[in-house]
């Protein structure tokens, strides 16, 4: 029997995921097929307080059930649903709500700077809310491994609305002319229903860069500000840093100075990591900051400006300046320079690359390069020679920032700072940043085990998932707990993260790659010292986890079951 599963988004991401997983497994045993299209369903199971007023459910057998019972006894729950589901008739007055008057076919794109957690969590939230409204939906994830669940031209043509939940600039050319609403992954994840309502009301036709755009569309794009452009550059730079850092770590595994011997494997690994990947790091950062601002016309001057930042010694700070300068100059020329129609084709090929590259290049050589190089040299010297007290303070600040909003602007600002310092061979801050970023999900997992009676069944299962995400350095694993109880979760995590960051800096921990969590330990030399680093993570996790276990108020469901 084809069965539609509708889960109220207000029940929370963790509980919804748990129910979906358990009922899916039980459905296969009961020979039920869980589908997404309400038009093909023979039966609909609704988990929530009420059945949605949706004409798509008319005439179908519908069963309204409790999510706690579905999680605790999924097979029995499905058996009850099959036996007691009754034909449903939507109220006449409810045949024209937002879901009915709004779009029926929605395509969406999600993307975050690292392309790991927020990308997929936002996608799941959009899918859940859209299906709850009876909409057809498909979400394309622009993750770290490229586009997943790609939207086809036919699906774009049939779509009534495009939703883009992205913290970085993404290629949206295939959606030209379609009504589009843009938001962030954070809002799409935490305020899904409100964002979908706004999408229906505020979507405007999308015009790719280079074509005429309405003032509204242009102002919305600029409202994203410098932060989004910077994160776009960081997201493209990140794989380069990871690959280069791990190659350098493998080279060091043969001996700290083994790469100095020509013709050896250690020398080859150092050439790949330090001589190539790290050499391209700043140009890629600058190039894609400019790309985010001006689209393809900004890429060439951005890459050239980034390369000059390397050659002048101004490093990642110079690269950031070059990227923004190149992007805005290229955009200015593209939008303000008017040419006869016969010469318009020369703008993207000749005029924009030449003029913008000259302006950026001369500025980097004569105005920006040397002063910024002096600033970067001073910063690097201070970081490498600072005393223990300053190191502990810096580690505590960075650690606390990583736990403040778990994947939000403050978290990403600290992360971008650490990644940028890798270009100057300063590895201490990055070690503190990754260690602290692992604390929130690990602490929530620990709390659910220490104080099991204070958490309901779904939260206990969510704690197990958070432990795995924490080991992978995915701070967002703690978001379901923080969203439910922010006044207790966030202070506990910030204190634990600050402690971890402080210990990491105090022991002089170094991290060669900016991602991967504890699995980076599998690469010899990627983290040093290993034992001290583990102690730092464990200390912060214990403080945050035990503090939250003590402060946490018991859930009503958990108290009822204990009684």
Curated annotation (Swiss-Prot):
The chain crosses the membrane at residues 236-256, 274-294, 304-324, 349-369, 382-402, 430-450, 463-483, 489-509, 518-538. Gene3D superfamilies: 3.40.50.2300. Residues 1-85, 104-201 form the PTS EIIB type-2 domain. It catalyses: D-fructose(out) + N(pros)-phospho-L-histidyl-[protein] = D-fructose 1-phosphate(in) + L-histidyl-[protein]. One of its GO terms (cellular component) is transmembrane transporter complex. Its EC number is 2.7.1.202. PROSITE patterns: PTS_EIIB_TYPE_2, PTS_EIIC_TYPE_2. The modification Phosphocysteine is found at residue 112. Residues 226-561 form the PTS EIIC type-2 domain. Keywords: Cell inner membrane, Cell membrane, Kinase, Membrane, Phosphoprotein, Phosphotransferase system, Repeat, Sugar transport, Transferase, Transmembrane, Transmembrane helix, Transport. One of its GO terms (biological process) is fructose import across plasma membrane. GO terms for molecular function: carbohydrate:proton symporter activity; kinase activity; protein-N(PI)-phosphohistidine-fructose phosphotransferase system transporter activity; protein-phosphocysteine-D-fructose-phosphotransferase system transporter activity; protein-phosphocysteine-sugar phosphotransferase activity. It is found in: Cell inner membrane. It is a multi-pass membrane protein. The active site is at 112 (phosphocysteine intermediate). Pfam families: PTS_EIIC (PF02378), PTS_IIB (PF02302). Induction: By fructose. Its main location: membrane. The phosphoenolpyruvate-dependent sugar phosphotransferase system (sugar PTS), a major carbohydrate active transport system, catalyzes the phosphorylation of incoming sugar substrates concomitantly with their translocation across the cell membrane. The enzyme II FruAB PTS system is involved in fructose transport. The PTS EIIB type-2 domain is phosphorylated by phospho-EIIA on a cysteinyl residue. Then, it transfers the phosphoryl group to the sugar substrate concomitantly with the sugar uptake processed by the PTS EIIC type-2 domain. This is PTS system fructose-specific EIIB'BC component. The lineage of its organism: Bacteria, Pseudomonadati, Pseudomonadota, Gammaproteobacteria, Enterobacterales.
